[in-house]
Amino acid sequence: MKKNNRVVVGMSGGVDSSVSAYLLKEQGFDVIGVTMQIWQDKDEEAVRVEGGCCSLSAVNDARRVANKIGIKYYVMNFKDVFKEKVIDYFVDEYLRGRTPNPCIACNKYIKFEELLKRAWMIDAYYVATGHYAVKEYDEERGRYLLKKSVDTSKDQTYVLYNLTQTQLEHILFPLGKYKKDEVRELAKNLGLPVASKPDSQEICFVTDNDYGKFIRENAKEEIKPGEFRDTRGRFLGYHKGIIHYTIGQRKGLGISVGKPLYVVDIDAENNVVVLGYGDEVFGDELISYNNNFISIDKLEREMRVKAKIRYNAKEQDAVIRPLEDGKVFVKFDNPQRAITPGQSVVFYDGDIVVGGGTIERKVR
């Protein structure tokens, strides 16, 4: 595609994507706002008024912003591919005893794959979002780099580590050099109707934050109760289905042995949830798969990095080493709490995202 200045901005109806659209228009881009319709409750008539990024209120907010700043605006249907790539994945991972991150899957398959395809269909060279991240081209490496946002408290590079070089060429992150307070202040000064709208906190398609209920309603198999066992294999009691548990969990176990117990492993094949004491939740080695690298073409030798194993975690000193089949062995300098299969581990070199992958298992 020939390079041009047309950009599709993914508009969720929130302040970040709204200000992103405004900033790009001010920079001279031909801006088209798009809200992705990605999920609907089973009762199609019951359109949610509040909540997720495809709710009626979100569409109305995005349309009002588009009218205010003077850009074209469309709602596009992504329901089928969202169900396949995000919903089904989310449910299947829980059924396998893993804890998925649907936002990472949505970014990988929907926002920066499917939306980019739609953008190209309407002759737009770029896609932009309200993510707090920085994209730069490094002449020396001949690669695009993904770097942390100026506002480190809002940095979202953890959920963007899957981006490819082709995708990065066509992506814009207008908010990377701004702090959240500055974005809200700008929205307020512009009179944008979403200036004071709170940030979304929950997974957009789980309306009441009840993951178990959502999985039961969307699973293709029955959720069966099973056994709690300790790390030596001794029976402790019964659980209500592995979908209700995640590594490091303490609440809601219903088991009392005089000392606090935590989920330390989930054996989906045998429908067993393994419980242990606090020190048994920690580990310093893991293996990741489905790895993607951004600052380097591939991991060819041992490399010292900072790594983190969940979105809100602090980065920790670690060494990464390539394994067969594209997997990566990660050794932390210090034990980490609740290394959770299904979550992502992301590697950093200062402000630069080296890459990352999905946690397959804790080694020890």
UniProtKB/Swiss-Prot annotation:
Site residues by UniProt (Interaction with tRNA): H131, Q343
Localization in the cell: Cytoplasm
Active site per UniProt: C106, C204
Principal subcellular localization: cytoplasm
Top-level enzyme category: transferase
Keywords: ATP-binding, Cytoplasm, Disulfide bond, Nucleotide-binding, RNA-binding, Transferase, tRNA processing, tRNA-binding
Annotated InterPro entries: MnmA-like, MnmA-like_C, MnmA-like_central, MnmA-like_central_sf, Rossmann-like_a/b/a_fold
Disulfide bonds: C106-C204
A Pfam family it matches: tRNA_Me_trans
Keyword Zinc: no
UniProt GO BP: tRNA wobble position uridine thiolation
Gene Ontology CC entries for this record: cytoplasm
Signal peptide region: none
Family (UniProt): Belongs to the MnmA/TRMU family.
Name assigned to this protein: tRNA-specific 2-thiouridylase MnmA 1
Organism from which the protein derives: Thermoanaerobacter sp. (strain X514)
Gene: mnmA1
